[in-house]
Regions:
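ASCE P-loop NTPase motor core, strongest for the SF2 helicase catalytic module
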Residues: 1-219
C-alpha cells in the first residue's frame, strides 16, 4: 500500500496540515498498522514535530505511553509544540537534577520528553515503564553504533520506534545502519555486508521505511 492511499486517521490537533504533512501522518500510521517503525527525514522546517504530534493525537488512548528523546536544546521546543497543537495531551519534560527527574518519571505522564544525556542516566527508571512509542529526534545522534546511548536504545523494549532526522541520512550508510538497528532491528544485513551493497539495493531495502521530502519539492 502507498501512504497516499492509506486513510488519514482522525487527528486531534489544533492545526491545518499541508498535503505533504498529511502524507507523512498517513505513512506513520501505515507503518504502525503493520508493526513497523520508520525514519521521517524531511528537510528542516517542514514540520516533522507537527507530523509526529498529529500522528500521536490519532493513536493515543488513556493507557498509551510515549517517550521522546531529543538533544537538550530541543526538548522545550517539543513541549511548546505540544502546548500549541495538542494542549489536551498530558506532556512533561523530564529534565533537571536526578531527584527532580526521578519524581517526574514517577508521576507517569502520558508523553515524556527528555534529552539523550538524561535518558542515558535514567535508563533503568525508563526500562521499568511500558512505552508504546519511542521517538528519536535528530536521530543522527546515534550515528556511531558503539555509543552508550545506541547500546541502551537497542536493548530498550518498546512497541514502536520512529526516528526523525533533518539531514539526508542516505548519504552515510554507517549512520543509516546504526539508526535502523534501533528503529527496525533485524531488517538490514550485518554492517559489514550492508556497507558493501550497491546503492540501488540499499535504496530498495530502506525505501518503505524512510520518508524524505525536500523543501523545494513541497513548498
Amino acid at each position: 500500500t502507498h501512504p497516499e492511499e492509506f486513510a488519514l486517521p482522525t487527528l486531534k490537533v489544533e492545526a491545518t496540515l499541508r498535503d505533504y504533512q498529511e502524507t507523512g501522518v498517513k505513512w506513520m500510521s501505515m507503518l504502525h498498522r503493520y508493526g513497523f517503525g520508520g525514519i521521517l527525514a524531511d528537510d528542516m522546517g517542514l514540520g516533522k514535530t507537527l507530523q509526529t504530534i498529529a500522528f500521536l493525537s490519532s493513536q493515543l488512548k488513556k493507557e498509551t505511553n510515549v517517550l521522546i528523546l531529543a538533544p537538550s536544546s530541543l526538548i522545550y521546543n517539543w513541549l511548546d509544540e505540544f502546548a500549541k497543537f495538542a494542549p489536551e495531551m498530558d506532556v512533561a519534560v523530564i529534565y533537571g537534577l536526578k531527584p527532580v527527574r526521578d519524581n517526574l518519571i514517577a508521576e507517569g505522564h502520558q508523553v515524556m520528553i527528555t534529552s539523550y544525556a538524561s535518558f542515558r542516566q535514567d535508563v533503568e527508571e525508563y526500562s521499568q515503564l511500558n512505552f508504546d512509542y519511542l521517538f528519536l529526534d535528530e536521530a543522527q545522534v546515534m550515528k556511531n553504533a558503539q555509543t552508550k546511548i545506541a547500546h541502551h536504545l537497542r536493548n530498550f523494549e518498546v512497541k514502536n520506534t520512529f526516528a526523525l532526522s533533518g539531514t539526508p541520512i542516505e548519504n552515510n550508510l554507517g549512520e543509516l545502519w546504526s539508526i535502523f538497528q534501533i528503529v527496525l532491528p533485524g531488517l538490514l544485513p550485518s554492517k559489514k555486508n550492508f556497507l558493501k551493497l550497491p546503492a540501488e539495493t540499499v535504496a530498495r531495502f530502506i525505501k518503505p521505511f524512510v520518508m524524505r521530502r525536500k523543501k523545494e519539492d513541497v513548498l
